[in-house]
Design a protein with these regions (language model features):
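Catalytic domains of carbohydrate-active enzymes, especially glycoside hydrolases
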Residues: 22-43, 106-107, 114, 118
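Alpha-helix-loop-beta-strand connector modules within alpha/beta enzyme cores
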Residues: 56-78, 141-143
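Glycine-rich, proline-tolerant flexible connector loops at the mouths of alpha/beta enzymes
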Residues: 38-66, 122-127
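Boundary/entry segment of secreted carbohydrate-active catalytic domains
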Residues: 1-20
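Short, conserved active-site loops that position catalytic residues or coordinate cofactors/metal ions
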Residues: 32-45, 75-84, 123
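Structural motif corresponding to alpha-helix initiation and N-cap regions
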Residues: 19-23, 52-60, 104
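Hydrophobic faces of well-ordered beta-strands that scaffold small-molecule active sites
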Residues: 6-12, 37-39, 73-78, 118-120
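Active-site acidic/histidine proton-transfer and metal-coordination neighborhood
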Residues: 67-69, 83-143
Length: 143
């Protein structure tokens, strides 16, 4: 039997307000004894709110800090996306398309380019749809 590779990682969200740049929070996490880190799309480089130039620059800085300190962001996730929209289950297709094109595809691309894992819960089903079996079935099929 081949076992999966498992990392004990520290989420960098605790550093959000005081250690903002990768070169400040990454050595702090390394000093705590972690070499694997989980970073949040939301706190670092939300694709819906930041420019491509900023995101590219952020990753250049992250890569330099990883090399300098011997730690690596192994996974990215989103929690904030979960709370601000019903996401892929939104009844308006325009919202769904915007999330897919503006957030999900760029997030997958970024994680893939870095050979990193990613996770998120990007859908919520509105109550009025949950109470209507036909609408719920349609929504479930879309997901």
């Amino acid at each position: 039997m081949e076992y999966p590779k498992i990392y004990l990682a520290l989420d960098n969200c605790f550093a959000l307000k005081r250690w903002v740049e990768p070169e400040t929070w990454l050595p702090l996490i390394k000093d705590l004894g972690y070499t694997s880190i989980q970073a949040s799309y939301d706190n670092e480089f939300d694709m819906l709110y930041n420019t491509k130039e900023y995101i590219d620059s952020w990753f250049e800085r992250l890569t330099a800090a990883e090399k300098q300190y011997g730690a690596k962001v192994q996974s990215f996730y989103s929690g904030y996306q979960t709370y601000r929209t019903s996401g892929l289950a939104h009844p308006d297709r325009r919202v769904v398309n915007s999330i897919v094109e503006g957030w999900i595809k760029p997030a997958v691309k970024i994680a893939g380019e870095r050979n990193a894992d990613m996770g998120f819960a990007l859908h919520g089903i509105p109550e009025n749809i949950m109470q209507n079996p036909e609408k719920y079935r349609e929504c479930h099929e879309k997901l």
